[in-house]
């Protein structure tokens, strides 16, 4: 190459060098993606056991896993339409596992998800110099919030107020919520409940589609608009 009256020899990358450089760039990109995924999981999945709750680890014993799969596959619509899930059933039916599968799948797609429980949230709120409003705002900032084991938290006036505040804040922002609980649908709809519990459960049922995970549900499911949306997704 002639430059300013002088001849310069410019080396050209051979095909193997180009390929090696491309492979190195791809390797660095994969490593960066894995680093970001690890960071999202470290923040969003506080309990390490949640990390292993993935669709590929499902044993196929409960067909309700299909609902979780369809929810992930149609996440864009679920988020836009503010469709949440209320995964119900006795201990050991897989409802928390299903929620974890959804969380991990969306995290791997680059979405920000928080999976936690109200016991942990309330402990953070009562810690030294905790800013309750900031904690709630942080939970609202996630595109998807998953609350595991609703009903195990303490029932003090303060606790119930904060539980409602978290749920209502997401309701006002029209952001989806997934809840797992051992409570039955009849329990959550009971008129014998105190006002604090009634307004919490009423808000959840307004936001989430009830899905019974304990085998065949002998209770009559309500034909709500959101339930129909999820059923349509499953049946194609």
Task: Give the ranges of each region predicted by the language model.
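Hydrophobic/aromatic beta-strand patches that form the interior of the parallel beta-sheet core
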Residues: 85, 114, 146, 178, ...
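Walker B catalytic acidic pair
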Residues: 149-150
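A short, basic N-terminal segment
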Residues: 1-62, 221-236
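Short glycine-rich substrate-engagement loop in P-loop NTPases that contacts/grips substrate
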Residues: 65-69, 103-142, 154-161
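Pre-Walker A (pre-P-loop) alpha-helix and adjacent loop at the N terminus of AAA/AAA+ ATPase modules
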Residues: 44-45, 51, 57-85
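Loop/turn-to-beta-strand initiation segments
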Residues: 111-112, 141-144, 173-179
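Walker A/P-loop nucleotide-binding motif
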Residues: 79-99
